[in-house]
Amino acid sequence: QLFPDWYLAQHRQTTLQGKDAETLSKAFDSIVKRCLTAPTVHVHRDFMPRNLMIPAHPGTTPAQQLGVLDFQDAVHGPITYDVASLMRDAFLTWEEDFVIDITIRYWEKARKAGLMDFEDWHSDFGAFYRAVEWMGLQRHLKVAGIFARLTLRDGKPKYLADAPRFIHYIRNTTHRYRELGPFLKLIDQIEGFEAASGYAFGRV
């Protein structure tokens, strides 16, 4: 309830009722259903550039070349979660061709590790990428709500200043999937935006 309670109700002063509330509920149901079908692994939950440290001194071994911070909340969750967190970052916006390139590299390494033996993911990067997008959508909605709460309840305005990035992610993703069309229209209505556009592996 972070998104409707904090981002919509508190930040946007919008309480959804009737058809709009039903649209949000159906979108959330679809997102949860998609995300829960993914295979699970250990996930960091906040895998982003700010939590990745590279030593400044030379002579380190490959195992010492990357430090990972803030891992105390790691859980067992969808294999799509960390790559979605990294490539749709809270504080940095990557070009979409770069996002796709890095996600392909992740997919290829995961295939070699035997982690893509699910449905047609092993042979179809597009299927995996769509799953990453749905996982990212869940995270974007949650974090938009968290950032609104941090600002409005906890007095930390710097967080809500990054909320437009998440709305951009949400709009671009919902634009690609027909079943999320009503949700996109609802977001556009609340934000006062026109229709979004972006890459898609076939609009589905």
Please annotate each region the language model reported:
Residues 1-45, 53-69, 77, 161, ...:
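ATP-dependent phospho-/nucleotidyl transfer catalytic cores
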Residues 2-11, 79-119, 134-154, 166-173:
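Active-site activation/catalytic loop segments of kinase-like enzymes and analogous catalytic loops
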Residues 12-22, 113-131:
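Short, surface-exposed acidic
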Residues 21-24, 99, 137, 159-163, ...:
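Hydrophobic packing residues in well-ordered alpha-helices of helical domains and bundles
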Residues 39, 44, 72-79, 129-137:
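Secondary-structure capping and boundary motifs in well-ordered enzyme cores
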Residues 49, 54, 75-77, 100-113, ...:
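Glycan-recognition and catalytic cores of secretory/periplasmic carbohydrate-active enzymes
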Residues 63-66, 74-82, 94, 107, ...:
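Conserved catalytic cores of large enzyme domains
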Residues 142-204:
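ATP/Mg2+ or Mg2+-diphosphate-binding catalytic cores
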